[in-house]
Amino acid sequence: MRISLKWLSEYVDLPAPEELARRLTAVGFEIEAVERTGAELKGVVAARIAASEPHPNAEKLSVTRVDAGGGEPLQVVCGAKNYRVGDVVPLATVGAELPGGARISKAKLRGVESFGMLCSARELGLSADASGLLILPPGTVPGTPIGEALDLDDVLLEVNVTPNRPDALSHVGIAREVAALLGQKVRLPKPGLVEGGGAAADAVKVRIEAPEKCARYAARVVEGVKIGPSPAWLARRLERCGIRSISNVVDATNYVLLELGHPLHAFDLDEVAGHEIVVRTARPGERITTLDGKDRALEPDDLLIADRDRGSALAGVMGGGDSEISAGTTRVLLESAWFAPSGVRRTSRRHGLKSEASYRFERGADPGMVIPALDRCAALIAGLSGGTVRAGVVDAQARKVASPEVRMRWDRPAQVLGMPVSREDARRILLSLGFEERASDGDAVSFGVPSWRVDVSIEEDLVEEIVRTLGYDAIPETLPGPAVRTPAESAEAQAVARARAALEAAGFSEAVNFSFVAARDLEPLAGGLAADGIALRNPISADLAVMRTSLVPSLLRNAAHNRRQRVEDVRLYEIARAYGPRAAGTPGDAPSHEATEVAGVLLGRRSPVGWAVGGDVADFHDAKAAVQGLLEALGVEAAWAAPGPGWLHPRTSAALRAPGGAALGELGELHPRVAEAFELPRGVLAFRLSLDALLAAARLVPQYRPIPRLPAVLRDVAVVVEDAVTAAAVEALVREEPLVEAVILFDVYKGAPLPAGRKNLALAITYRAPDRTLTDAEADAAHGRIVARLRERVGAELRG
């Protein structure tokens, strides 16, 4: 919004432009630019033509002598013919630079010296008229700077008005803010309306058929108008604010729009069929040609200003071409109304049509400005066009748009702002902004909100008005009282963070998937995982139709997608919720439940091929190592038992259980039918763990163990056992020896010369006593007891 300070100064006394810009920015109206006009015409003054005679050497030129207010007349050669001796015209003196870039210098034209240039409006950058010299008003004093003579000197502010403050989209709106800041009263413009002739109600009728979209529609009639150009002062004001001058009547509506902020529209009354205005919604198939020349198909939601036969305007957006003001207009119907913002907004967007009127109506016009703006504009049209305003207003009011009343506790500003605010200051500020003090009960007061403030509805809005006017910089800088404490991280959050770190350290990348999958993705996993997912009522697509009962299907689809993109080595994990029907006997009333899972998929090579590394394919032990690292990160002890559930291969899978027997999850190679269903090769490994079960068995708080100060004794043992004997069972028997500190399985071997059905397990055992240094004899005795225990319990044979 462009604001002219010369125009604004008619309503309120102003400080220096820079100070005004600073103060307005501080209260929420950011000043994006400050532009000074008239300065570009420095060196151009008013000059009276004292004499003129033909050029001795050029028929089309004249030699004039002009009085520029500096004593001796100046000789200027001129080519224009539209002047007479005694006229006052603009003179660009020697040294002046015109807007087009031309610098004036002393010159000799066809043998005659010229000391300047007499200018047209085009040469001054004021208009496109280059037909002759710009003739100034007769009383203009020679030597007056042209900016002053033509009222060109001004300062323009480019104000960024936020969408919640439509009341500030006018000069009077900004004047209200300035007056409140400076402790002044606004000098509102007086309509100066003089009525005559017959009654307006005899010339036009108004009817509202859509009260929910139009609360009020008022009209005046001006007769005997003569359409013509606007006076220079009015045209200049409009142009400075970015609006092109059209004619005196149309310019009057735009002038009041910029002055008071209320949109108006002028119709040619003789083009209004039946001299009747009907405010209604569009009928099926109805069309209208708007002022921009476009024929538009209307929707039933569009609000029309219609006459007896057809639509004449899109209400609050743009007028129609059938009833626009033309050169032959003699009777004007002037409209002032209040339209519902939502309806104007929808119509404007639907038709891609933006106007100064729609910009204001869709943000919320002032219902209290309907009649004042109408009277002001009618008086202006009558004065500019020589017309007569018929008596009275044709006013149709379908409903009243009431302004709210807001109650404020006197101590509320101090509570919100953290600084003391006296009752006197709060009352003074709100009254200066147009609020009306009403009922008071000692501790609180009610204020009536002015009709133009559509953004104020609650107590905090009043507090905002107070602090805006006081200045945000008045709020003292204070440090917070109590120390800020970081909330303790939940056990689940700690477990998730540790699980992520452990899996990423093992080379896995995190995947993030939808919680929805295709129903067909659950069917192959029926052995061990719920196959009946919760169906969505409105799925995104058939491939995302049910809630996933496990994270595994999503990860298998990720792996298949990577393979299609020629990515053969894949390690992915996901930590998220899975959903399924609630099992019978479980607590809760909901028919479904959700639980957090940790799942992963692994396929391809164990590590990238390099000069020192081969291309070994990852197997069950790689997946187990990753899961084991996760368990250790959470402090979970788990027992491994083969085989795993049915969706895993029976020979290369295992189920995990906590020491108390609670199920933790499973790990292993995909069953061939599952791999085939997801278009994956054999050998793909996957794991699924319940985070809730892991949390129940976890030791997230580290247990202190002192660094051993006594040396350990290391022994290796290799035993041959049946295939059915698990390494975990052997390890558990070894740990029964009190002096054993650690056991590591470092080799498993099957094949010749071992007989079929047997395997070799090699373990590294660490012995240590907490209170003494072990002797070799003590270590050998413990080692012997372990071998005997293995031979007795699992039929192990010591391999030499």
Curated annotation (Swiss-Prot):
It catalyses: tRNA(Phe) + L-phenylalanine + ATP = L-phenylalanyl-tRNA(Phe) + AMP + diphosphate + H(+). Gene3D superfamilies: 3.30.56.10, Bira Bifunctional Protein, Domain 2, Ferrodoxin-fold anticodon-binding domain, Nucleic acid-binding proteins, Phenylalanyl-trna Synthetase, Chain B, domain 3. Keywords: Aminoacyl-tRNA synthetase, ATP-binding, Cytoplasm, Ligase, Magnesium, Metal-binding, Nucleotide-binding, Protein biosynthesis, RNA-binding, tRNA-binding. Residues 401-477 form the B5 domain. PANTHER family: PHENYLALANINE--TRNA LIGASE BETA SUBUNIT (PTHR10947:SF0), PHENYLALANYL-TRNA SYNTHETASE BETA CHAIN AND LEUCINE-RICH REPEAT-CONTAINING PROTEIN 47 (PTHR10947). Mg(2+) binds at residues 455, 461, 464-465. Residues 708-799 form the FDX-ACB domain. The keyword Calcium does not apply. Residues 38-147 form the tRNA-binding domain. GO terms for molecular function: ATP binding; magnesium ion binding; phenylalanine-tRNA ligase activity; tRNA binding. Belongs to the phenylalanyl-tRNA synthetase beta subunit family. Type 1 subfamily. Tetramer of two alpha and two beta subunits. GO terms for cellular component: phenylalanine-tRNA ligase complex. One of its GO terms (biological process) is phenylalanyl-tRNA aminoacylation. InterPro entries: aa-tRNA-synth_II/BPL/LPL, B3/B4_tRNA-bd, DNA-bd_dom_put_sf, Fdx_antiC-bd, Fdx_antiC-bd_sf, NA-bd_OB-fold, Phe-tRNA-ligase_IIc_bsu, Phe-tRNA-ligase_IIc_bsu_bact. SUPFAM superfamilies: Anticodon-binding domain of PheRS, Class II aaRS and biotin synthetases, Nucleic acid-binding proteins, PheT/TilS domain, Putative DNA-binding domain. It comes from the Bacteria. This is Phenylalanine--tRNA ligase beta subunit. Its cofactor is Mg(2+). Binds 2 magnesium ions per tetramer. The keyword tRNA-binding applies. It comes from Anaeromyxobacter dehalogenans (strain 2CP-C). It is found in: Cytoplasm. Its EC number is 6.1.1.20.
